[in-house]
């Protein structure tokens, strides 16, 4: 979720599809600008071409569901954001071997309900409840 200016080299707001490239020629990120603000789905990549993260923006703000990936392509985590860019909804993170690491729910940036933490073989290590 790199900080990419929404203004072009002439001081005008960017509009339409956008791609940024690494020195090796591979795509670093791709998405769309609407009047200088990130909009819709954006994808970010590592310099080997592997996807690093993907998710949505609305009026330049991070919103909706996002997914992050390990270098091996396995999911690193998933989670959502509300319209104020606060964590919201079910969040999950994974160990590098693909096993679930932790899971729980956010409500507008605050942990709520039962959160569970697992070791890398899937065994439940801890449960904690947030109000």
Task: Describe each PLM feature range.
Residues 1-131:
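Glycine/tyrosine- and acidic-biased, solvent-exposed loop/turn segments at the edges of beta-strands
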């Amino acid at each position: 979720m790199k900080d990419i200016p929404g203004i072009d080299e002439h001081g005008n707001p960017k509009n339409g599809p956008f791609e940024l490239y690494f020195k090796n020629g591979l795509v670093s990120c791709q998405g769309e600008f609407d009047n200088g603000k990130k909009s819709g789905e954006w994808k970010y990549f590592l310099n080997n071409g592997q996807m690093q993260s993907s998710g949505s923006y609305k009026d330049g703000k991070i919103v909706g569901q996002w997914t992050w990936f390990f270098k091996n392509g396995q999911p690193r985590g998933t989670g959502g954001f509300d319209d104020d860019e606060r964590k919201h909804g079910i969040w999950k993170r994974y160990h590098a071997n693909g096993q679930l690491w932790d899971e729980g729910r956010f409500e507008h940036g605050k942990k709520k309900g039962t959160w569970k933490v697992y070791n890398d073989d899937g065994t439940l290590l801890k449960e904690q409840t947030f109000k």
